[in-house]
Amino acid sequence: AGGAGLAAAAVMRGAEAQAPASNPPAQTGTPPSTITNPPRDWSAGHPSIYPDPDVLVIDPSFRSLAPGNAAVRRVWTGAQWAEGPAWSSQGQYLVFSDVTGNTQYRYLWDADMVVPFRKPSNNTNGNSLDFEGRQLSCEDFNRRVVRWEHDGSLRVIADNFDGKGLNSPNDIVPHPDGSIWFTDPPYGDRLNEGHPDEAGGPTNPQGLLKPGVGAPNAGVIGGKKRELPTAVYRWDPSGKLEQIITETQLPDPNGLCFSPDYKTLYVISTGQGPGDTGPGGKREVYAFDVEGTKVANMRLFTDMMLDGVKCGPDGMRADVYGNLWISSNAPLGYAGVLCFTKEGKLIGRIRLPEVCANLAFGGPKRDRLFMCASTSLFVYQTTTQGAAPG
């Protein structure tokens, strides 16, 4: 029995020696992103693996808009509060604002660099380019909307409604009929983004703040005291200014944009602003039918809730398919951009390491999504195009 057992053991050892070795388990890593520890390094010379871990596909349809071989890139940093990007197809540059830094910048496409453009900028906030390539800007400090003509001159489009000074025009879009539509919340009616009211005004009830101190343009302060509720306005080329959405309908309007066919107007309602007596907006996005010079059929487009997190919207743009790309002011991991279909379905998002205020499509093909996020400018190459103009 002992000899037979030894022989059997030898056979088993031989069989084990001939058995193929098992393959070791695959070893894969987790690419750094905005939410890993350590987090992603956004400085130059630190490329991301493809597909970019901060470009998140929620619905398969998003893959047709967000290619797997493109990365989100930080183009520049150095702002205090970056806002209002708009693309000039004639000049091949992106203009954007540093609201609290009181400076406008240009990102030059060919040079791939950011340079100062206007300083002081009158705390310019939102910008756009009209159908003739002229820059439209909302000035928080002067509480007005202006247009820069091709000869370099400045035209004031609107600084009052029915003789009362505007609050602080915030975002602006042109219409093919030559009209200009803009929002007028109160966010620039404070010291860091523009100037507070004169003594006794809603944003300076005790009169302790001095609006003109240290302001290089104090002599042309517009809107001494807040006199109007928040609203959305339409300026007609004839010079007529109409209030098309009231504060009762939609408090604290902020970002706005048209659908590609100009049949729908989207408006963001953000939170309570300085001097507001009401509760402010709910940080939601609403849609309106455009009927000539008026709007109708107000409806909720999205409440901007994701995983129980309120992704507070600020600015937005539509692409040629009618998708809405909306900025997200939310905690890390949800800050960035959310993409919705025209039916209001969330299909994808882009995470950024900073809160995103506004965005615009640009580049020669108008396929680059530029994102103004707090102190930085980011860009991502898509496979769609922005609905022109910027």
Question: For each predicted feature, which ranges?
Answer:
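Short loop/turn segments immediately following beta-strands, especially the blade-tip
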Residues: 288-294, 382-387
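A short loop-to-beta-strand structural motif that recurs across blades of beta-propeller domains
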Residues: 103-105, 144-146, 231-233, 284-286, ...
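Beta-rich, blade/repeat-based domains predominating
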Residues: 77-92, 120-139, 144, 162-182, ...
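N-terminal export signals
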Residues: 1-18
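Blade/loop signatures of beta-propeller domains
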Residues: 33-70, 389
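Blade-level signature of beta-propeller repeat domains, shared across WD40, Kelch, NHL, RCC1
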Residues: 360-390
